[in-house]
C-alpha cells in the first residue's frame, strides 16, 4: 500500500523517534509498505517519521542506481533501531534531495565513512562500517530518526535562499508527483 509522505512542517519530522521491539504490530507489512511508497516516489530511502510514525525504522533501495553502479543490484534493506556510532573519512559535498522537501536540492557535506549498529527485519543485531554513497544515504535517513532534515546542515545563507519554498510547504501548497500529507 502506498502511504502519504509527510512534508516539511509536519511535527513528526522534528521528533526523535523511538526504538521498537519485535512485538511491534504488523512490522513486516509496514516495511513492505515503506518500500512500495519509496519506490513509487522515486526515492532511495524512507524513514518511518516521513510516513507519520515516530519509530526507528528505515528502508533503503539502491537497486535503481544499479545500471551505473552494479554493486547496488538488488540492494533493498530495512534498518530497525539504527544508530550511527561514528562518522569519519573524508568530508564530501554532494547534492541531496528529500521526499519530505519536494523540489529542494542542495549540496550537503557529510563524512564518507560511518560505523552503524542496527537490527534487520528478524531483529538480528549488526555492527558495520559503511562507505561512499550508502554511508551518505544512511546518514540522511537516520537524521530523520533524530528529528533532523538535510536542510539543517545548510549555511544560514543557503537556508535563506530556500525560505520561499519552505514557506510554500508550511502553507500546505507543496507540489509533487506522489501522495503527500501536508500542513493544513
Curated annotation (Swiss-Prot):
<dbReference type="GO" id="GO:0006412">
    <property type="term" value="P:translation"/>
</dbReference>
<comment type="function">
    <text>Removes the formyl group from the N-terminal Met of newly synthesized proteins. Requires at least a dipeptide for an efficient rate of reaction. N-terminal L-methionine is a prerequisite for activity but the enzyme has broad specificity at other positions.</text>
</comment>
<keyword id="KW-0648">Protein biosynthesis</keyword>
<dbReference type="InterPro" id="IPR023635">
    <property type="entry name" value="Peptide_deformylase"/>
</dbReference>
<keyword id="KW-0408">Iron</keyword>
<feature type="binding site">
    <location>
        <position position="140"/>
    </location>
    <ligand>
        <name>Fe cation</name>
    </ligand>
</feature>
<dbReference type="Pfam" id="PF01327">
    <property type="entry name" value="Pep_deformylase"/>
</dbReference>
<feature type="active site">
    <location>
        <position position="141"/>
    </location>
</feature>
<dbReference type="GO" id="GO:0043686">
    <property type="term" value="P:co-translational protein modification"/>
</dbReference>
<protein>
    <recommendedName>
        <fullName>Peptide deformylase</fullName>
        <ecNumber>3.5.1.88</ecNumber>
    </recommendedName>
</protein>
<dbReference type="GO" id="GO:0042586">
    <property type="term" value="F:peptide deformylase activity"/>
</dbReference>
<feature type="binding site">
    <location>
        <position position="98"/>
    </location>
    <ligand>
        <name>Fe cation</name>
    </ligand>
</feature>
<dbReference type="InterPro" id="IPR036821">
    <property type="entry name" value="Peptide_deformylase_sf"/>
</dbReference>
<feature type="binding site">
    <location>
        <position position="144"/>
    </location>
    <ligand>
        <name>Fe cation</name>
    </ligand>
</feature>
<dbReference type="GO" id="GO:0046872">
    <property type="term" value="F:metal ion binding"/>
</dbReference>
<keyword id="KW-0378">Hydrolase</keyword>
<keyword id="KW-0479">Metal-binding</keyword>
<comment type="similarity">
    <text>Belongs to the polypeptide deformylase family.</text>
</comment>
Amino acid at each position: 500500500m502506498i502511504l502519504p509522505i509527510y512534508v516539511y512542517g509536519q511535527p513528526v519530522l522534528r521528533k526523535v523517534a523511538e526504538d521498537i521491539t519485535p512485538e511491534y504490530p504488523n512490522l513486516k507489512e509496514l516495511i513492505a509498505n515503506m518500500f512500495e511508497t519509496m519506490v513509487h516516489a522515486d526515492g532511495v530511502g524512507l524513514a518511518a517519521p516521513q510516513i507519520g510514525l515516530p519509530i526507528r525504522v528505515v528502508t533503503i533501495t539502491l537497486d535503481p542506481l544499479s545500471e551505473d553502479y552494479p554493486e547496488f543490484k538488488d540492494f533493498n534493506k530495512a534498518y530497525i533501531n539504527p544508530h550511527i556510532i561514528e562518522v569519519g573519512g573524508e568530508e564530501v559535498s554532494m547534492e541531496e534531495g528529500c521526499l519530505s522537501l519536494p523540489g529542494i536540492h542542495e549540496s550537503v557535506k557529510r563524512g564518507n565513512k560511518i560505523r552503524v549498529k542496527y537490527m534487520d527485519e528478524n531483529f538480528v543485531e549488526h555492527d558495520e562500517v559503511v562507505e561512499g554513497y550508502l554511508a551518505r544515504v544512511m546518514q540522511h535517513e537516520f537524521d530523520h530518526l533524530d528529528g533532523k532534515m538535510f536542510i539543517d546542515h545548510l549555511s544560514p545563507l543557503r537556508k535563506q535562499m530556500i525560505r520561499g519554498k519552505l514557506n510554500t510547504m508550511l502553507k500546505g501548497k507543496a507540489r509533487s508527483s506522489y501522495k503527500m500529507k501536508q500542513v493544513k
